[in-house]
């Protein structure tokens, strides 16, 4: 579009109505006040920047989680207008800037002005003002027309007037906000959730750069999302680690007149050799999880185009075999995206697009492009058709296998499916089913359970890897058949019915070893691929059986993990100890000693983060130069040896200036501020980070109240931690459980099944795209990506966690 169509100033800001209800009923505007609503605040601010990009005025967005938990979103767009808004000023009887209008008045913004934004993701116009209303602290910085402006708010009310900060070369808007803890159940942002959405936006808006940073974690590298190929790159990303039937995704793009203006439609699609259908649809960058007219139009056109090609080229295999849309979409990965001037969504959460004109536009554009593509690429078309017929034959075979399974289940209903031991309660809301690894553990679980509401289904060995199997084979697998029959809700897209689920909680309980982890992963793969609604509705849980039982005299406790065990031993060892620094005679005990120990643990966390980047700590220490440790690592090009350490931002900038590709390859080893704080705190005790491994010269003497334990001098910080853990082990008996079968029924009940004491982890789907990527890589046919993943993460594994 022409960037000069209309000047974007205060006159472009249109007000529809006023604000107060947001704080009283926040759920009406952001969905809820839990984790979902919290992250929705960030999306609302980012959407404004994306709208600028869609209008052609913004190329970069930076999203940062601040060290103190706040959020910063900045862009290089035009900047929110700051002039006096005449209409609202007259209405309120005072001079009010357009910036204040945008941030304090509901349904105010440039998106209602058709010349300022042709298309916008924020349909309801409540976005940024809603974020302001629900923030304890909110700061807007605007860089516009050579001047920098700032304004601060709290809970939607201005704390300062619009301030002019001075001249600037920057342009754009920066929003900083801190969610109000009196509104939200949690104010802790999950970077995985944010990264999922930012990745989506970068794919959907070709050419925009979105940078994500997390200042809370010294070991986290900033992530840059940039995809020149747009949704074609999105499909390639989704098909990564899968065997694609042809190299480049088919791209569909077109624009046609709709009821309210031009509708821009685009789609990208590619088949792979797998059996799962994966289609994501979007309207104005908003995920439409329930589809809508754009997806229906695309799917209809796809089915017609394939059937038409088969008919016109006499490729039908059999008159008796009829093809369905499901057959055509087996192994299909597709992205469908539409830009609509006036989108009509069903409900505030915008899950489904309802514009009828969009459906016909999507169908027409898709049909034209696909028909032409198949005619111009007969080899690809034949490959697709061959797969479609194999899918149809497999569907018929799976249908027969399903019917056989249903008949067999009906005949065997008197003894229940598999080895299921059912509960007495019949209300699914009150019932739970444990899927237990092995007959031995299953026996203990049966004896230890509360038979009123707990059912037990033992499974034998590793179940089928459904990532590599068609439905026909899945139905023939005895263990999976038992799970399907026990749950009672069916399987797949067409035959799954959540209302028929017999247990509201499905709990996976496996051993705390490698085999147990493998079985758990196989089960999760099955649920994700064929009963994903169970995960989406929070019905799948993972039991947390203890790894250790520690006892001291008559007292005992259970410990879930190696990390918890280390903390427990360290706490015991520290509790009755005293340390003396030999060079200064400084003494520490009680809370003062705990603070010193926690500081050493911070050093250990720093080392772990460093070694996750494949930088051994000893090598890092050896690179100390001119009073400084390296801040960045510049790895060599693929297949070459060497690599350079960079000690400052200036050295990094010089490397990027010499080679633009360096920007993507240079690794930030740590956050300088966090490292400096650790060093400063160590200096308070007369130590440095290198003393974690290398002796200082003088030692730290540890003594205890136990007269039978002699004093011991440690010469490194690591030795202090190891010795205190050793003291913690004295006088206690430690039993490590390798399997559930090692616990008797009472122990299993007390630790893993008693609702009053147990720990369950609910399986959630924060990022469906990344979940698909991981399941494909770890459980799919392709070996090289799995090997690369294992090799790249090998340094992240602590030897103490290996089950050898």
UniProtKB/Swiss-Prot annotation:
Q: What does this protein do?
A: A type II topoisomerase that negatively supercoils closed circular double-stranded (ds) DNA in an ATP-dependent manner to modulate DNA topology and maintain chromosomes in an underwound state. Negative supercoiling favors strand separation, and DNA replication, transcription, recombination and repair, all of which involve strand separation. Also able to catalyze the interconversion of other topological isomers of dsDNA rings, including catenanes and knotted rings. Type II topoisomerases break and join 2 DNA strands simultaneously in an ATP-dependent manner.
Molecular function (GO) terms for this protein are:
ATP binding; DNA binding; DNA topoisomerase type II (double strand cut, ATP-hydrolyzing) activity; metal ion binding
Catalysed reactions listed for this entry: ATP-dependent breakage, passage and rejoining of double-stranded DNA
Q: Which domain of life is it from?
A: Bacteria
Under the heading NCBIfam families, the entry gives: gyrB, PRK05644.1, PRK14939.1
Organism listed in the record: Chlamydia muridarum (strain MoPn / Nigg)
Question: What keywords is this UniProt entry annotated with?
Answer: ATP-binding, Cytoplasm, DNA-binding, Isomerase, Magnesium, Metal-binding, Nucleotide-binding, Topoisomerase
Q: What is the lineage of its organism?
A: Bacteria, Pseudomonadati, Chlamydiota, Chlamydiia, Chlamydiales
Q: Which GO terms describe its biological process?
A: DNA topological change; DNA-templated DNA replication
Q: How is the cofactor bound?
A: Binds two Mg(2+) per subunit. The magnesium ions form salt bridges with both the protein and the DNA. Can also accept other divalent metal cations, such as Mn(2+) or Ca(2+).
Q: What is this protein called?
A: DNA gyrase subunit B
Which InterPro entries does the record cross-reference, listed alphabetically?
Answer: DNA_gyrase_B_C, GyrB, HATPase_C_sf, Ribosomal_Su5_D2-typ_SF, Ribsml_uS5_D2-typ_fold_subgr, Topo_IIA, Topo_IIA-like_dom_sf, Topo_IIA_B
Q: Where in the cell is it found?
A: Cytoplasm
PANTHER family in the record, alphabetically? Answer: DNA GYRASE SUBUNIT B, MITOCHONDRIAL, DNA GYRASE/TOPOISOMERASE SUBUNIT B
Q: Which GO terms describe its cellular component?
A: chromosome; cytoplasm
**Protein family membership:** Belongs to the type II topoisomerase GyrB family.
UniProt cross-references to Gene3D superfamilies, sorted A to Z: 3.30.230.10, 3.40.50.670, Histidine kinase-like ATPase, C-terminal domain
Q: Which Pfam families match?
A: DNA_gyraseB, DNA_gyraseB_C, HATPase_c, Toprim
Give the positions of the site Interaction with DNA: 462, 465
Description of how the protein assembles with itself and partners: Heterotetramer, composed of two GyrA and two GyrB chains. In the heterotetramer, GyrA contains the active site tyrosine that forms a transient covalent intermediate with DNA, while GyrB binds cofactors and catalyzes ATP hydrolysis.
| Residues given in the record as Mg(2+) 1 binding sites | 437, 511
Asked whether the UniProt record includes DNA-binding among its keywords, one would answer yes
Q: Name the Enzyme Commission number(s) assigned to this protein.
A: 5.6.2.2
Outline the extent of the Toprim domain.
431-546
Note from the entry: Few gyrases are as efficient as E.coli at forming negative supercoils. Not all organisms have 2 type II topoisomerases; in organisms with a single type II topoisomerase this enzyme also has to decatenate newly replicated chromosomes.
Q: Where does Mg(2+) 2 bind?
A: 511, 513
């Amino acid at each position: 579009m022409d960037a000069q169509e209309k000047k974007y100033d205060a006159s472009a800001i249109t007000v529809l109505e006023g604000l107060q209800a947001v704080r009283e009923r926040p759920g009406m505007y952001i969905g809820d006040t839990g984790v979902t609503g919290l992250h929705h605040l960030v999306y609302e601010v980012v959407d404004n920047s994306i709208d600028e990009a869609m209008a052609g005025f913004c190329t970069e967005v930076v999203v940062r989680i601040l060290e103190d938990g706040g959020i910063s979103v900045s862009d290089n767009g035009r900047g929110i207008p700051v002039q006096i808004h005449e209409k609202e000023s007259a209405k309120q009887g005072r001079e009010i800037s357009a910036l204040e209008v945008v941030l304090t008045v509901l349904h105010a913004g440039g998106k209602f002005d058709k010349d300022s934004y042709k298309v916008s993701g924020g349909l309801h116009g409540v976005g940024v003002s809603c974020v302001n209303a629900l923030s304890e602290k909110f700061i807007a910085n605007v860089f516009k027309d050579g001047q920098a402006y700032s304004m601060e708010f709290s809970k939607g009310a201005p704390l300062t007037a619009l301030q002019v900060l001075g001249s600037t070369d920057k342009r754009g808007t920066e929003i900083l906000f801190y969610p109000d803890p009196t509104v939200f159940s949690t104010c802790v942002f999950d970077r995985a959730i944010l990264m999922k959405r930012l990745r989506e936006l970068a794919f959907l808006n070709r050419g925009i750069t979105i940078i994500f940073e997390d200042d809370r974690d010294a070991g986290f590298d900033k992530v840059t999302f940039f995809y020149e190929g747009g949704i074609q790159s999105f499909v390639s990303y989704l098909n990564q680690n899968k065997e694609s039937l042809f190299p480049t995704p088919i791209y569909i793009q077109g624009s046609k007149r709709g009821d309210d203006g031009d509708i821009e439609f685009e789609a990208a699609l590619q088949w792979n050799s797998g059996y799962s259908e994966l289609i994501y649809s979007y309207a104005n960058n908003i995920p439409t999880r329930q589809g809508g007219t754009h997806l229906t139009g695309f799917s209809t056109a796809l089915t017609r185009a394939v059937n038409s090609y088969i008919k016109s080229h006499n490729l039908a295999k059999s008159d008796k075999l009829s093809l369905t849309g499901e057959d055509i979409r087996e192994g299909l990965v597709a992205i469908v995206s539409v830009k609509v001037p006036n989108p009509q969504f069903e409900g505030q959460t915008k899950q489904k697009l309802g514009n009828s004109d969009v459906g016909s536009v999507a169908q027409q554009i898709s049909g034209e492009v696909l028909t032409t593509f198949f005619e111009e690429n007969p080899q690809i078309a034949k490959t697709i058709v061959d797969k479609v017929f194999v899918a149809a034959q497999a569907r018929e075979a799976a249908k027969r296998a399903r019917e056989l399974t249903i008949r067999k289940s009906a005949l065997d209903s008197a003894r229940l499916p598999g080895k299921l031991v059912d509960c007495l309660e019949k209300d699914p809301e009150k019932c739970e089913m444990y899927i237990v690894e092995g007959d031995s553990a299953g026996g203990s679980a049966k004896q230890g359970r509360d038979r009123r509401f707990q059912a037990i289904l033992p499974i034998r060995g590793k179940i089928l890897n459904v990532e590599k199997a068609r439905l026909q084979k899945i139905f023939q697998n005895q263990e999976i058949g038992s799970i399907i029959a026990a749950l009672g809700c069916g399987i797949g897209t067409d035959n799954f019915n959540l209302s028929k689920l017999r247990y509201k909680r499905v709990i996976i309980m496996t051993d705390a070893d490698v085999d147990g982890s493998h079985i758990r992963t196989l089960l999760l793969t099955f649920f994700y691929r064929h009963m994903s609604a169970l995960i989406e509705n929070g019905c799948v849980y993972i039991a947390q059986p203890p790894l250790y039982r520690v006892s001291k005299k008559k007292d005992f406790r259970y410990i879930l993990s190696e990390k918890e065990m280390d903390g427990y031993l360290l706490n015991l060892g520290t509790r009755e100890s005293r340390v003396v620094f030999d060079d200064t005679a400084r003494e520490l005990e009680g809370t003062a000693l705990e603070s010193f120990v926690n500081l050493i643990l911070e050093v250990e966390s720093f080392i772990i983060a460093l070694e996750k980047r494949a930088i051994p700590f000893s090598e890092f220490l050896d690179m100390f130069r001119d009073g400084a440790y390296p801040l960045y690592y510049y790895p060599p090009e693929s297949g070459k040896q060497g690599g350079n350490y960079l000690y400052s931002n200036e050295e990094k900038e010089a490397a990027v200036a010499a080679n633009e590709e360096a920007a993507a390859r240079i690794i930030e080893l740590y956050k300088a501020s966090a490292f400096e704080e650790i060093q400063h705190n160590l200096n308070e005790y007369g130590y440095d980070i290198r003393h974690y491994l290398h002796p200082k010269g003088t030692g730290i003497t540890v003594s205890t109240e136990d007269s039978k334990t002699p004093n011991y001098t440690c010469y490194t910080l690591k030795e202090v931690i190891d010795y205190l853990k050793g003291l913690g082990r004295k006088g206690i008996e430690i039993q490590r459980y390798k399997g559930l079968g090692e616990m008797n029924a009472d122990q299993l009940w007390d630790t893993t099944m008693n609702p009053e004491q147990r720990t369950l982890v609910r399986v959630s789907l924060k990022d469906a795209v990344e979940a698909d990527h991981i399941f494909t890589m770890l459980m799919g046919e392709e070996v090289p990506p799995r090997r690369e993943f294992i090799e790249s993460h090998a340094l992240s594994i602590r030897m103490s966690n290996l089950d050898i």
